[in-house]
């Protein structure tokens, strides 16, 4: 194999062994069509190993492997990798992931997780570098998951953006206290303000009062936030969520704001895609877009995950409010309306216990009313203080907007 781009997209492409067999990445996933078939020559021999004229003979020529065309834009991929690596360093995290996804088609334009892999140099492969962790690893999403809670409530007709909720300083559940990330006095908020200010208390109470936890659980399943996406990449993670019948009150509250549930960055990106494209349809994320050698058509599944599409416009407007007036101000892309959600989740160690003053940070968003419906996720893990990944998102979307000549409608 020759890798002209070095480490760029190295995790996506993956590794082969000395015999050319795929070991990781797309080399493994598409091994059967990439490696081709060896030829065979069998001759009947006589004395001294000489072929017998007219004897049994098998002559099967070798078959070349097929070419495949991927959705990855290598220049955009390089930019995303460089910006993500810098962002992880600036924020002080242990590792990070980024996804740039076309919500209209399911094409993965760029995807990366630090540390990176250079398939052409195996002398120093870092731990965790051989797979795209945005696909293969679960994490607790934190407040970016609140969008799913609000989508479910809007779909059910339980709330509007102006529905109010009384928010005490904290609420109690099973001897625990739930409060917001930032100190505030008891107040009354609209649903739009709850999302913009990322209130854990407000989100919990709105779901409890206007949807119910069983209703939320059903929608989580419908949105595909507990299942693998079906992406063409080996080792995709599935989500983790226990059945609602086992939920305690504290777990019920926690799920509404993205704790006590695990999923992959690609799973949440797919969900946001169904909002960004305005149709409620989620397209299977994928890399393969063409098989030119065979001419075989490549198709991918789509699913109507948001059934009441009347919920999409008000939800999008509320996500715009997050960037205009709330926790996501630093994500605003100049010249465009920007919608999205910040997330800060407490970091859980290998035992499942939360580590004090250690966080996973993320942002996922899109550009409403633009000529291209790209969704971008950026997450940084194991950060020793509360910050955000908004600026990395902003820079990636700014680069994409310029590169693809995206215009505001």
Identify the residue ranges that each predicted region occupies.
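Flexible, solvent-exposed loop/hinge segments and secondary-structure transition points
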Residues: 20, 85-96, 100-105, 113, ...
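Short, gly/Ser/Thr-rich active-site loops of penicillin-recognizing serine hydrolases
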Residues: 296-299, 391-409
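Small/polar-residue-rich segments within soluble enzyme cores
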Residues: 1-65, 269, 393-398
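Conserved, well-ordered alpha-helix/loop/beta-strand core segments that scaffold catalytic motifs
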Residues: 52-96
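A short acidic/glycine-rich loop-to-helix N-cap element
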Residues: 381-392
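Amphipathic, well-packed alpha-helical segments that form the structural scaffold of globular domains
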Residues: 31, 35-38, 81, 85, ...
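Structural motif corresponding to the C-terminal cap of alpha-helices
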Residues: 83-91, 116, 323, 404
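Beta-lactam-recognizing serine transpeptidase/beta-lactamase-like catalytic domain environment
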Residues: 47-57, 103-142, 148-378
């Amino acid at each position: 194999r020759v890798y002209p781009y070095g480490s760029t997209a190295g995790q996506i492409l993956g590794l082969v062994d000395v015999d050319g067999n795929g070991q990781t990445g797309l080399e493994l996933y598409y091994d059967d069509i990439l490696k081709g078939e060896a030829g065979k020559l069998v001759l009947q021999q006589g004395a001294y190993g000489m072929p017998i004229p007219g004897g049994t003979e098998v002559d099967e020529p070798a078959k070349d492997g097929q070419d495949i065309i991927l959705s990855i834009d290598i220049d955009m991929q390089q930019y995303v990798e460089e910006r993500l690596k810098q962002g992880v360093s600036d924020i002080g995290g242990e590792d990070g992931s980024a996804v740039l996804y076309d919500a209209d088609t399911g094409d993965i334009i760029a995807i990366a997780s630090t540390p990176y892999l250079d398939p052409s140099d195996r002398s120093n492969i870092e731990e965790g570098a051989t797979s795209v962790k945005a696909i293969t690893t679960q994490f607790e999403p934190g407040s970016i998951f609140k969008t799913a809670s609000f989508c479910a409530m809007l779909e059910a007709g339980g709330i509007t953006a102006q529905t109010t909720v009384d928010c005490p300083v904290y609420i109690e559940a099973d001897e625990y206290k739930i409060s917001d990330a930032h100190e505030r006095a008891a107040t009354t908020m609209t649903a739009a303000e709850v999302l913009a200010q990322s209130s854990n208390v407000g989100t919990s109470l709105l779901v409890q009062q206007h949807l119910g936890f069983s209703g939320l659980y059903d929608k989580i399943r419908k949105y595909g936030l507990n299942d693998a996406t079906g992406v063409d990449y080996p080792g995709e993670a599935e989500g983790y969520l226990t059945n609602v019948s086992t939920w305690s009150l504290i777990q019920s509250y926690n799920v509404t704001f993205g704790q006590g549930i695990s999923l992959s960055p690609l799973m949440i990106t797919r969900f946001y895609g169904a909002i960004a494209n305005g149709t409620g349809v989620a397209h299977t994320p994928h890399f393969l877009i063409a098989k030119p050698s065979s001419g075989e058509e490549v198709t991918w599944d789509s699913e109507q995950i948001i059934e009441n599409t009347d919920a999409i416009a008000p939800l999008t407007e509320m996500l715009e409010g997050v960037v205009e007036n709330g926790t996501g101000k630093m994500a605003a892309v100049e010249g465009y309306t920007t919608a999205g959600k910040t997330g800060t989740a407490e970091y859980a160690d290998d035992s499942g216990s939360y580590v004090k003053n250690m966080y996973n940070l993320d942002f996922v968003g899109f550009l409403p009313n633009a000529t291209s419906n790209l969704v971008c996720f950026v997450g940084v893990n194991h950060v020793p203080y509360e910050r955000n990944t908004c600026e990395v998102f902003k820079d990636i979307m700014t680069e994409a907007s310029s590169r693809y000549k995206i215009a505001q409608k």
